[in-house]
From Swiss-Prot:
Organism placement in taxonomy: Eukaryota, Fungi, Dikarya, Ascomycota, Saccharomycotina
One Pfam family hit: DEAD
Composition-biased stretches (Basic and acidic residues): 299-321
One GO cellular component, as annotated: membrane
Residue ranges of the region described as Disordered: 246-321
Keywords tagged on the record: Membrane, Transmembrane, Transmembrane helix
UniProt cross-references to SUPFAM superfamilies, sorted A to Z: P-loop containing nucleoside triphosphate hydrolases
One function term, GO molecular function aspect: ATP binding
InterPro entries reported in the protein's UniProt record: DEAD/DEAH_box_helicase_dom, P-loop_NTPase, RLR_Helicase
Ranges annotated as biased composition (Low complexity): 251-298
Protein name stated in the entry: Uncharacterized protein YHL050C
Length: 697
């Protein structure tokens, strides 16, 4: 099987089909120079959980759902993704596999992350489950050649069914004759990939060997494991026994001629029960065994064999009777806790402050507050140490309650972010000064915030109606609908192809000159930072930016100073997983379109450089004012996650072709500081005069 790129195996249940791929996957995972990512697909959702637990139980494999891969991309940690047939047939999955090499290079900056095995269980379902065949159509779009090996398993599929099932998902089918692997390697088919190979069938049901199932009965002089049977010379495992004048302490017992250690006991004439055994003058109970002159000290005591137990009893320190310490709050604290629990009843769930305000789940999805944590808050605001982490009170005055998943402090962080959504930089700075009495009291701030609950809800609905309409794809931005844009910018008269060409030209110039990306898009400063372009992972990338002082300049020059000192830096590590996944997926679709047109694929920026660009544009006040003036369908957004989400919507260019908004942003940014685009300069006086206008004026 090692020389066969595609195999189908038919074997009865219990024969060991799982180990057929489990052991090779462990071997792949143990390779240090290359990281392999494999995929297993089962027919039904009910099989997922048990399958993941079984394969990940030994700790040799990191196992995760395929949904994580589809939504977020490869995380660089998981060895095996497990999903169902619907995942295998989904467009997002096939697109990610098609663009695997490009995505890996952009994400991990290395080619040492490869696709390993594709395993499909219960292969016969592709042919026999006629009512689901329409759902399997997308599997034919999968690039099987990208995988190192494909394994198809079934317990019931004869060769005819297996052959039809393989052809239904786009493969050649079963081999019609025995294959000489040496001849196969010499053939021209070898260059066409796995999908052109006929699949070799291993029918283990025809084998005459028998596999014993279950447990065997016990005989004289046998060892009984997890069963209840004893003989004259038998050894009972997982039980404890005592005999005349013997002492049983937890799991060990002694007899006249034998010694039982840890979990084994031997007796001359013993009777085995579920947990304990007693002899001639003994009594069997569920946990303790006693004899005629013995005492079983299950509570960490030793018994005296000659009956004088009191003088020889040993009392360890842990046996001193002590009432467990319990914090006893005052009646005022208990009353406060009850009031807060009534006011915020859903903190036992994964609740956020938008849910508390009354927004629907579909609205929360786009008004998301991911990346809002302690680092979002300025220094000194809800960041005190040495106090309760949940409510920032002294421990004896803590008002948190058992089972609380969302702490009051976390809700206060999110409430502060909601207030930021509604205020520009100057207004937010004043707001932070107004709430100074609550800087060390998130619970008090939540009470203050909840008083304006309805007012805040209405404000968000008014101010972000345009944002929800665009991000929920209910409205599409068209540059031709922006009168000011058509009159004031050449970019708004470009075709979609021209905008894309300009976007790739900008990135090509940045790459050649090794320009620091974030600083360039922040203020058009073309400082060099070669370490940034040579960085192999996110950590090295951030260290390169920190070394040249990018984050310090950003905090001193822009509104980034209104957040914690680590806030921008952490955007490159643990936040924006969904956006990263969407961006990587767009690379795959872009690559596929270029290959279909016969065009040489363009070099696209990797994720960290792309995120640097969007962060630089977000904090570039001059650019933001110009874009909002020219593009009349959008208004201000004051949270970085909202800006990133907005930048990834599609807009209609002058020729009605779709381009991502971030490409249009880069073109406008280039127009502000370049002679490459005619009429590139913009009237700053006019911009400042109209920067305070309302959308729609």
């Amino acid at each position: 099987m090692a020389d066969t790129p595609s195999v189908a195996v038919q074997a009865p249940p219990g024969y060991g089909k799982t180990e057929l791929f489990h052991l090779p996957l462990i071997a792949l995972a143990s390779k240090g120079d290359v990281e392999y990512v494999s995929f297993l697909f089962v027919p039904y959702t009910v099989l997922l959980a048990n399958c993941m637990i079984r394969l990940g139980r030994c700790g040799c494999l990191n196992v995760a759902p395929v949904r994580n891969f589809i939504e977020e991309g490869c995380d660089g940690v998981t060895d095996l993704y497990v999903g169902i047939y619907d995942d295998l047939a989904s467009t997002n999955f096939t697109d990610r596999i098609a663009a695997w090499e490009n995505i890996v290079e952009c994400t991990f900056r290395t080619n040492n992350v490869k696709l390993g095995y594709l395993i499909v269980d219960e292969l016969h379902n592709f042919e026999t489950e006629v009512y689901r065949q329409s759902q399997f159509g997308g599997i034919t779009n999968l690039d099987f050649d990208a995988f190192e090996k494909a394994i198809f398993l079934s317990g019931t599929a004869p060769e005819a069914v297996a052959d039809a099932a393989l052809q239904r998902i786009g493969l050649t089918g079963l081999a019609k004759k025995s294959m000489d692997i040496n001849e196969l390697k010499r053939s021209e088919d070898l260059s066409r990939g796995l999908s052109s190979y006929p699949t070799r069938m291993f029918n283990l049901i025809k084998e005459k060997s028998k596999v014993p199932l279950g447990t065997n009965a016990t005989t004289t002089a046998s060892t009984n494991v997890r069963t209840s049977a004893t003989t004259t010379a038998s050894i009972n495992v997982r039980t404890s026994a005592t005999t005349t004048a013997s002492i049983n302490v937890r799991t060990s017992a002694t007899t006249t001629e034998s010694t039982n250690s840890n979990t084994n006991a031997t007796t001359t004439e013993s009777t085995n029960s579920s947990t304990n055994a007693t002899t001639t003058a003994s009594t069997n109970s569920s946990t303790n065994a006693t004899t005629t002159e013995s005492t079983n000290a299950s509570a960490k005591e030793d018994a005296n064999k000659d009956g004088n137990a009191e003088d020889n009893r040993f009392h360890p320190v842990t046996d001193i009777n002590k009432e467990p310490y319990k914090r006893k709050g005052s009646q005022m604290v208990l009353l406060e806790r009850k009031k807060l629990k009534a006011q915020f009843p859903n903190t036992s769930e994964n609740m956020n402050v938008l849910q508390f305000l009354g927004f629907r789940s579909d609205e929360i999805k786009h008004l998301f507050l991911y990346g809002i944590d302690i680092y979002f808050c300025p220094e000194g605001v809800f960041t005190q140490y040495g106090l309760c982490k949940g409510c920032q009170k002294m421990f004896e005055l803590c008002v948190c309650w058992a089972g609380q998943k969302v702490s009051y402090r976390r809700m206060a962080w999110e409430a502060l972010a909601v207030e930021r959504m509604l205020r520009n930089d100057e207004e937010y700075k004043e707001y932070l000064e107004d709430i100074e009495p609550y800087h060390g009291d998130p619970v008090g701030y939540l009470k203050f915030f909840s008083v304006k609950r309805r007012e805040i809800y209405s404000q968000i609905q008014r101010n972000y109606a345009w944002y929800l309409a665009i991000t929920r794809r209910r409205e599409t931005i068209s540059v031709l609908d922006s009168t000011r844009g058509k009159q004031g910018s050449q970019v708004f008269r470009m075709s979609g192809r021209q905008i894309k060409e300009l976007y790739y030209k900008v990135w090509s110039n940045l790459r050649e000159s090794k320009t620091e990306v974030l600083q360039y898009f922040l203020n058009w400063d073309e400082k060099k930072c070669q370490e940034e372009w040579e960085a192999k992972d996110d950590t090295v990338f951030v260290e390169a930016l920190e070394k040249v002082g990018v984050f310090q300049r950003l905090r001193s020059m822009t509104s980034a100073g209104l957040q914690g000192p680590q806030y921008v830096k952490l955007q490159f590590s643990r936040h924006h997983r969904q956006l990263r996944s969407r961006y990587e997926l767009s690379l795959g679709m872009h690559l596929r379109d270029q290959l279909a047109l016969g065009v040489t694929p363009s070099k696209v920026p990797h994720w960290t450089a792309f995120l640097s660009m969007l962060i630089g544009l977000f904090y570039n006040k001059t650019f933001r004012q110009k874009l909002e003036y020219l593009l009349e369908q959008i208004s201000e957004v004051w949270l970085l996650p909202h800006w990133l989400d907005l930048a990834n919507v599609e807009v209609l260019a002058a020729d009605n072709t779709r381009v991502p908004l971030y490409m249009l942003m880069v073109a406008v940014h280039k127009e502000l500081d370049s002679d490459d685009v005619p009429d590139g300069r913009f009237d700053i006086i006019l911009l400042c005069r109209d920067s305070s206008r309302e959308v729609g004026e």
